[in-house]
Each structure stands twice: as structure tokens, then as C-alpha cells.
Amino acid sequence: MSYANYRYMKARAKRWRPENLDGIQTSDEHLINLFAKILSKHVPEIGKFDPNKDVESYISKLDQHFTEYPSLFPNEHTKRQYTLNHLEELEQQFAERMFSENGSLTWQELLRQTGKVQGSNKGDRLTKTFEGFRNQLDKVQFIRKLMSKANVDDFHTRLFILWMLPYSLRKLKERNYWKSEISEIYDFLEDKRTASYGKTHKRFQLQNKNLGKESLSKKNNTTNSRNLRKTNVSRIEYSSNKFLNHTRKRYEMVLQAELPDFKCSIPCLIDTGAQANIITEETVRAHKLPTRPWSKSVIYGGVYPNKINRKTIKLNISLNGISIKTEFLVVKKFSHPAAISFTTLYDNNIEISSSKHTLSQMNKVSNIVKEPELPDIYKEFKDITAETNTEKLPKPIKGLEFEVELTQENYRLPIRNYPLPPGKMQAMNDEINQGLKSGIIRESKAINACPVMFVPKKEGTLRMVVDYKPLNKYVKPNIYPLPLIEQLLAKIQGSTIFTKLDLKSAYHLIRVRKGDEHKLAFRCPRGVFEYLVMPYGISTAPAHFQYFINTILGEAKESHVVCYMDDILIHSKSESEHVKHVKDVLQKLKNANLIINQAKCEFHQSQVKFIGYHISEKGFTPCQENIDKVLQWKQPKNRKELRQFLGSVNYLRKFIPKTSQLTHPLNNLLKKDVRWKWTPTQTQAIENIKQCLVSPPVLRHFDFSKKILLETDASDVAVGAVLSQKHDDDKYYPVGYYSAKMSKAQLNYSVSDKEMLAIIKSLKHWRHYLESTIEPFKILTDHRNLIGRITNESEPENKRLARWQLFLQDFNFEINYRPGSANHIADALSRIVDETEPIPKDSEDNSINFVNQISITDDFKNQVVTEYTNDTKLLNLLNNEDKRVEENIQLKDGLLINSKDQILLPNDTQLTRTIIKKYHEEGKLIHPGIELLTNIILRRFTWKGIRKQIQEYVQNCHTCQINKSRNHKPYGPLQPIPPSERPWESLSMDFITALPESSGYNALFVVVDRFSKMAILVPCTKSITAEQTARMFDQRVIAYFGNPKEIIADNDHIFTSQTWKDFAHKYNFVMKFSLPYRPQTDGQTERTNQTVEKLLRCVCSTHPNTWVDHISLVQQSYNNAIHSATQMTPFEIVHRYSPALSPLELPSFSDKTDENSQETIQVFQTVKEHLNTNNIKMKKYFDMKIQEIEEFQPGDLVMVKRTKTGFLHKSNKLAPSFAGPFYVLQKSGPNNYELDLPDSIKHMFSSTFHVSHLEKYRHNSELNYATIDESDIGTILHILEHKNREQVLYLNVKYISNLNPSTIMSGWTTLATALQADKAIVNDYIKNNNLNI
């Protein structure tokens, strides 16, 4: 081995440090210890086998070895493989042939039938030992762990690894693959015995002293090498350059390289002596290959010296059917159009066949990747790196545990498992085993569990996740906001040095609150398990993690840290300050037992990649992969692919000047009336867009300390603006660009109004920057008259201008004039507005501007973005530009907006309820109905189930329920009272009042037999008492017809008095009461009263004061008329004959007048049948005018009609239509309900009401908790209790009703309403209950 080879090997070995390497699973600890002892020369010897000795003794030793290390030899296969590796080559071939013929042979039988086993030297045995277990361990992890354990010199260990990599950790059939490895290892293998390492090391040390700074390049082995002479690269970078190679023998051949993305092929030189891939400028131009600047310019030596300052993006190329992805340096001249270096071939495991002049790709073998080291200054925090921590159950942190709050406890999830193929079954078992071992999951007995599914990782492996979608429907949302990207970037301004930290298994660092674990149960073929840590997939996890990390970081996040989920960026203005900041953050993470993923961390960088941007001191640019996504886009074949392309472009829109002008030819193809036809115009448009992205502009961080300039302009159809800031070189650099189309109404504005609209829209767009400036910022406009309109203090010309001037008062600015020729940027933006941006609706000039009821403030945007994280579909749209383009959805200021200019919101959230409340209760329309409210809200917002949620809210609105009348058909079918068996058993009574006074009487007592329909009419007064009524009933009814069995009457105080109760008890009849103001309950009496009144009008209409004189005639006329229900006269049914009604007529007597005679029984039977038939007809007719009965349950809240029942009715047209609500106590009949009335009115009204007088009170505590109309609250007598709903305090109060001052009511009202009614008693209650208002 040459000295140069040794120096190179040593440099490579030094870069591989054990402390930078990942750990390995503890289940393989025995194997680690075994090989650590091998390297430490403490190998447990099985013994060199003598072929002349007994085979059984060697089998015994092997069996003992297998028993000592059970985890290394878990099955027959591993033991048999180990045995094969300890046979000589011929015996090994013989044994393998035997096993192929008989796969059931054991390792003992293989040894016995082979006949002899020959040991070998230590190096060979070590090699075979590694080979025997190469498939049991991940090679990279195994080597890293091994290096950290070996008690040998680090240098020797690393050289040993260099030897083992190509020779021992390959599959058997590729044992000779090491011959094609890099020549340093090939040369080193000439002296591969570990015993000679030390001698070689000492020899090279002596050589090194003598040679001093001798060049690494030797003339005899660099003749054909090409040198890279870097112009701006340090010596350290130069020594570690991956293109350096001083010993490799050069081989060249030319192949045709296919570029499928660009549909072309180019001759390509395969040059093992080349140090980098190169391509000529002519080739780049000919095939329109996208390039970008290369910051590390180099001078490329050789025959064609070139200065290189550009390179291509990563291109997909195909060589002999082998697909690779690589980039090329662009040179002016070269012998071939392109060249591919040995490094590219090596990185892609491509081997050159010099005899066949072809390439072949070997199976990929993972490489040991250099990972970032933890700087020495932070070594004290080494114990929080993933390399020193395996995943384990974290300790709970009080107040930061993950809580799973459900909207209901009695829920059931669908029981189903997703089918899993064998490959995924193995991945599932690995995940379950690892989770059980680390303690983050455990077996569960939960009755509800969600299924598991698998998603691919970036590296191609599978990740098991739980599909918590069914559970998320019942999880209460977490409204903690996720930070806005723009606000995070704004905090970085002024920083020059950055450190990025990434948390390892971030979600699994948070414990689940004790008692909530069963809610996170998941189901798989192995059983049911539950998480003890916060899992992925639960809807509230992102918000809780953001709250968790913000709490851990504390005040640091306000000064020197920005974090988005598990990505943490520490930024400082100086190196010394940065060390303090990093230590502060690491200490906070250490205190919380959090672990960082060192492989993804970057320390003390001048620029970093963070949340999709490359961030530096100067500003931020988009990440290269997002740019490459556009640069590599093929020509769209249809509208769907074109929308996807424009979606990717729109994501980078803020970095592409004149976006709309560039996309205009493409947008034309998306119009409905345009036929799809791809022309060179569209092709050129895509090329122009790609060219703009080759070197995107750097947008500066906004700095509140720097001067601000806002340039605006308006064209006929659009407005535009650019926001800039003045930097130390006295130049203005852009912070952002803005352009927007005008609506149809805005197109009709005057020129001055359009120019002012440009200012208003720009200020709204950058409000978070411009509203809080201390010094005034400048606004430049090219419309001179606009300055006077804004600075003029006279009365505004119209309401729109008045609103604008009021809006401008929130900003501190001065406006100046600049001609349009100088204001070129804003002028261009106003004329080149992005046609993909939605046009706002025509609502600017409406007299009632419903759309602007909700102001789109920053707080509102934050709340919307937070809600997005809890909705899987909207979160997918937020993160997937292609999906947005496909569904014609825009992303504007963090909000998703559809083609109708509606903001998309998650369904049924606190935010949507707030929006409904704003428009329904606080809008310019007074409590609009369902349809009107839906149409108003749909002008600006939409979400799934919007109509259903609005309907629920309006139906639950207390104000609407008690004040709006119902137009539906009355409730409750007619329930006729069954007829009695004979006359005068069942009677009905009532009074006809409001009659003119006649002979001292002003009322009429009416008694009707419900069987015969006979009526008894007795004149009386309105002031008749219960005692007088009883005497009158005794003399005029009982004396002639005997005692009745039951009497039906209304709830008049006479019939409910104690006197009447005693009278009923004396004559042994039962009183039944009809419902108040429900005439259908006792329809017979009502009908009789109507007939009597009609007859009285006929006989005394000219002399109404003589009605008493005609009562006997009216009674006789009524009782001798054939009744429609019985088809007979009442008199005939009762007396069994028909009296003479005129002097010419004789009475008709029956031969059998005995009531027990057969004829009388037959008559009664016929009457009863007629009554039943009449009841059926009457019910059928009545029920045609009603709707299905509303069934109430005890405990339901109902309202009582005021106007129809007179219940709590105040003679006031503005009084509420309903009283209540009241609780239902019980059902007292088919259609009647008894209500729980307040004690103060129980004596005034019956507590039983027919269902037709009731309306269900819809009460959803999440929507509206108040049950009292605030206008009805008079004096508050007492406060019973309080509740908090949605941060609003509600009080349950007893009060005197304003509508009925004699009535004491109770119900729920808001604190604000209660304070207006009685401030003193409310304040006393707050003080006594220690309420924090």
C-alpha cells in the first residue's frame, strides 16, 4: 500500500466516529458483545478442528456455543448457516448440495455426512462469523454499535471496518464483489491480517515524519486524473472532497444516455478517472435542460480549461437500462456531450464490464453515512440524543399530558379490520413487538378500538398507523392555534446564525392522561392494544403538541426560538449569543426528558432548511425540491395535469415575478368554452416559468426597525402592490408582492376609487406588518388626486369612502405621488394579476353588506388554520397543491377558498357555531330564518353539513322560539269520548255568558245529556256561586232525571271549588274537566251553546232584553229537533214518545214505554250505534286538518301558546307568542300533558294542556343556554345556580315577569342580562360564590 493510500484511508477512518452513530436494538446485544470480544482479541474459541478427531466432539462444542448465545441462533437455519461457514470450500459445496437435495437435514447431520470439518485461521473465521449473521442485523447499525464497544485503538477499529465492509457483509454469491470496490480498499486488502495493522501503522507514522507536507498526489498514479482547483473552498473542504481519487486505474467507454423526461438521448462518456459529472453548454441548450447557479465555482482543468458556475438539476437518466438520478456541472467545451464519473457509478452500485463494454447494477448495499456530530461545546447534552436513547415510555409531565375529551361517552365504533398481506403482517408484528418492549403500548380490554393500516416511508419501508377517523368524530376539538408560517419567518429577521433541532418520535414523548388510554385503543389481527403515549392520527394531537412544545420552550420562543411542531429553529445575531441560546433550548429539552434526532439536526449554520424554505441572514427562498418539482414537469396532456402544474407554480408564486403574465396562455386552456389544443405558445409559457425558477429571488425578512415602502397601482381590471424595506446600502429590497382582480362591482368604480381600492387591499394583505408601525411608512401612488382625497378632512362622498377612511385610521403612513413610469413594479402587478385567484363577489355596494359581517382578521385566520389541523380532508388540501388545483381550490393568506369565493371550514366546530351566531343574532337582519340565514352565510363561507347546522341553531334559538308563530297544522288527532249506555248517565255543563240583561239575568246555565243530546236551559247571573249552581242543578236536573254517573265541565272556579266537590260526593258522581281553551275536548257542549245562541237570535233579535221569556220555547225547539248524531229527537229518546208541537197535531205514544222493555233496549242500542258512527265520521274529518302528534316525554321543555289559551297573556301585540319554557311532568291523556308551572301561577291556571297548545322547546346547551326572553325579566328575586357555557356565564334566576307583574317565573339568562335587571343582587351572588369574572 502506498503512503498516499494510507493517508486517504486514515482520513476516511477519522471521519467515522462512534459517538455520531445510531444505536442498535438491545435484542442483538449478545451478537454485539461477541464481535466486540473478537476485535479485543478475547474471542470465545470454539477450537481449531482437527479433521482426524471425532466429529461428535466438534458437534458438542458447537451445540454449547449455540446454547450460550441463544439470541444469535434462534432457529435451525442460523445454526446450519454458521456450520456451513466453518467448512472448507470443497466440504462447504458438498454440504450445500446435500441440503439442496434434502432440505430437512439438521446442522448435526450435515456435519456427520460431510465427514470432516476443518478450522481455519483467525481472520477467515472472523470473516465467516460476520457472513453467518449478515442478514440478522442492519449492517450500518451493527458496525456503529460495534465500534463504540471495541476495546481497541480507534484507528485500528476503523481500518478493520474498511476491510470488513466490502468483504464480509455481502451475500455469499457476491463474495468477490469487493474486487470492484474503490482501489484504496483493494490495495489495503493486500495486507488484511489484523495482526499486521499495528506494524503498518508504525511504519506510516515514521514515513509521515520524514515527508512532512508532501503532496497527496503521486505522479505515477495521477497521470490520468483530472484536478479540481477550487477558488473559494477551505483546505478542510478540499481534503474531504468526494471527487478526489489518486490511485484508481482509469477506464473509458461511451454509452447512449436516455433522458426520458426530455424525450432525448445523448452520447455519454463513462470515465472512471473523472471526478465529477459534466455536460456541455451546447447540449444543455439543444435539449433545454434546466440549470441553476452553483455557488462553489471551480476551474476545471485538463485539455479544455473551463470556469464552472452552473449545474443542472438532478436529471433522470438511463444507462443500459439502469435508471439513476444525478446532476451535471455545465462546461463550455468537452470532448463528449456529457461524462459520468466513477463516483456516480459507485454511489449507484454500477459495475463496469470492460470486456463486454456494458454496465450492470449490483444489489444495493446500505452505506455508512456520515452524520452530523454534536459539537464539543454541547457534549454535556449528549444524553438527550437519539444515539444514546432507545425509545421508551416517557415520564408524565403534570399539566402537559394528552387528554382525550369526548363529546359523548356512550359511543360505539364500527368493528372491522383492514385485510393485511403477509408482508404487512410482518411489519405489524415488528411494530407491536417494539411498542410492547419499549412500553409505549400495552394490551387492552377496551370495547371500542380503531383499525390499523400502513403507509410507506420515504425510504420505502412501511409505517404502521392507526386509522382514528371513526374516533375523531367523537373527540372534542382542541382550539390551540398552530403558528402561521409568515409570522414565524418574520421573527427570524436580523439573525445570522441558525441551529435546527428535530425531536425524535415527537408524539411519543407525551404521555396520555391516566384513564384515557382505553380511548386510544387499536385493533389488529394480534389483538387489541392501547397507547400510553400520544399517537399519530388523533385529530387533537397537532394542537396539543404545539401547546406542549410552546410550554416547554417558554419565553425562549418569543426571543430566539421558532418552532413548528417538532421542528425547532434557534436563531441568533452572533456566535457567542447563539451558544447561550442553544444551551438554553437544550437544557429545556433535557429538563422535559425530550430526545433530539441528531441525524436531522444542524448546528451553527449560516443557512438552514426549515418548514419548506431555505433561510439565511438575507431572507428566504423556496426549497430546491419544490423548484425541481416544477422544473421536471412534463408537458401536461389534459386539463387535470395542467391544473396540477399551475398548483405547483402557485405555491411558488411569491417568488415568481409577473406570475399571471407567464401563466396567461395556460389559464386560457382551462376556460370552459376553450377547446383543449396544446400549441408552442403554451410550451414556451412553461419554459419561461421554469427559467424564472432556475434562480428565484430572495425575499427579505420583514424588519420593523427598517423603513417601509408600499407601492400600489390599479389598472382597469386589477390592483397590485409591492412591499419593500430600505437596507444598509440605502436600497429597497422586496418583502413581498401582491395582486388581485376586481369584482364586477369594483370594475364600475371611478379611477380614484380604484386607486384607493389598491391601497385598501394592500393594507389588508400586509396588515400584520403595517398596522403596528411606530414611525410612519410611505405609500407611493401614481394617482395625484388620491392624495387629496385621503388627506382631506371633509365629509366623505359616500358610505364606501367613509368606511375606507375609517379603516385607514388604524395605520400610521404618509402618502406621496410618483408617476406611473417610475412605479413600474406595482403597475405591472396590477396589469398582470394571477388569473387563478378567485374574483370576490359583488357585495361592495349593497346597502346591507351581509358578507362583511365577519371580519377576516389575523385572529380569525389563526382560528381557521387551527381548525384545519383537525380536519383530515382540509389538512390534505392545505398541504397538497396538486389536490387543490384538481378541486379548483385556492390557498390565500392561509385560507382555503373555492371557486365560489367561499372560505372552506371544517364542519360543526366552535368556529362555525360562532359564525352562525354572528349572522343570526348580531347581524343587520333580525333573527333571519333558516333559508335566509343559509343564503347569507353561503355568500362567504361553506362547510359540510352547513344547512343542517344552521337549521339546528335556528330551531334552538330562544328568541325565535318564543316570538315567532308556528304555521304548521295543529297537533293531536281528535279523541272522541265514548257514549254512555243510557240517557242522563253522562252529562256536560257550561255557561253562556256575555248575554244582555233580561229580567235580572245575564247568563245561561246549559246542561246536556251526552246520550240523548237533550238540553236543560236555566237562566242565571255571571256572579252565580257554587252553592247556587248546585241548588239549581239539584232542582232542575236531578229532581227530574236522577243522579248522573259523571259530569264533564271546564275548569271554571265553580266546578273546582270545595262546595261543588262536596256536592258531587253527596250525589256520587265523578267530575271530569275539559282542557282549557280546547273546545274539541267537550265539543258537544260547545255545539249546543252555538245552537241555543242561534235560536235565541231568531226569536229576540229585535228585543234582545227579552231572551229570558223565550227560554222555554228555545229548549222545546232544541229537544224536539232530530239530532244528526242520533237520527232521533232528544225528547223521543228520553220519553219514548213525540209530543204534539201544534194544535193540529196529536202526541204519539209508544205501546211500550218501560225503559226495560225490549223495544226501549233496541232504541238505546240504535242510538249508541249512531253515536259511535258519528264519532268516527267526526274524527276522520277533524284529523284531516291536523298533523302527527308531537310526543313529549317527562322532563322535556315545552312552550305554551299565549294568544290562543290566554295563558300568561298580556293584551299587547308586541308580547311574545309563547310562554315558558316549562318542564313536562307526565302525560295525562292521549293528547294531554301536565306541566310543572311555577308556584306563583298554579292557582291561576290549570297545569294540564292539550298538545295543540304546546310547542317543543329546542334547547342545545352548545348553541344557546338562555331560556328567558330578556324583555320578560323584571325584578330578580333570587339566583338559584350558575353554569359556564363557551366562556359565557349563565344564571338560573327567579324573577317577576314584566309581561305579567303578578307572576313569578324562573329560568336561565346571561350575566349581562341579569346585571341590567338587578345589578345589586347579581354582584352579591358573584361575591358570595367567588366567581372570577
Curated annotation (Swiss-Prot):
Signal peptide: none
Region (Disordered): 209-229
Binding-site positions, Mg(2+) 2: D990, D1050
Active site positions, chain numbering: D271 (for protease activity)
Binding positions (Mg(2+) 1): D502, D566, D567
Family matches, as InterPro entries: Aspartic_peptidase_AS, DNA/RNA_pol_sf, Integrase_cat-core, Integrase_H2C2, Peptidase_aspartic_dom_sf, Retrovirus_Pol_polyprotein, Rev_trsase/Diguanyl_cyclase, RNaseH-like_sf
Compositional bias of kind Polar residues: 218-229
Alphabetic keyword roster: Aspartyl protease, DNA integration, DNA recombination, DNA-binding, DNA-directed DNA polymerase, Endonuclease, Hydrolase, Magnesium, Metal-binding, Multifunctional enzyme, Nuclease, Nucleotidyltransferase, Protease, RNA-binding, RNA-directed DNA polymerase, Transferase, Transposable element
Residues annotated as domain Integrase catalytic: 979-1138
UniProt PTM comment: Processing of the polyproteins proceeds by an ordered pathway, called maturation. It involves the initial cleavage of a 27 kDa capsid protein (CA) from the N-terminus of the polyprotein, followed by the cleavage of a 56 kDa integrase (IN) from the C-terminus. This leaves a 72 kDa protease-reverse transcriptase fusion protein (PR-RT), which does not seem to be processed further.
GO-annotated cellular components: cytoplasm; nucleus
Domain Peptidase A2, first and last residues per copy: 266-342
Entry's Gene Ontology molecular function annotations: aspartic-type endopeptidase activity; DNA binding; DNA-directed DNA polymerase activity; endonuclease activity; metal ion binding; RNA binding; RNA-directed DNA polymerase activity
Domain (Reverse transcriptase) ranges: 436-615
GO BP: DNA integration; DNA recombination; proteolysis
Domain of life, per lineage: Eukaryota
Note: Retrotransposons are mobile genetic entities that are able to replicate via an RNA intermediate and a reverse transcription step. In contrast to retroviruses, retrotransposons are non-infectious, lack an envelope and remain intracellular. Tf2 retrotransposons belong to the gypsy-like elements (metaviridae).
Identification of the protein by name: Transposon Tf2-9 polyprotein
Biological source species: Schizosaccharomyces pombe (strain 972 / ATCC 24843)
Organism lineage string: Eukaryota, Fungi, Dikarya, Ascomycota, Taphrinomycotina
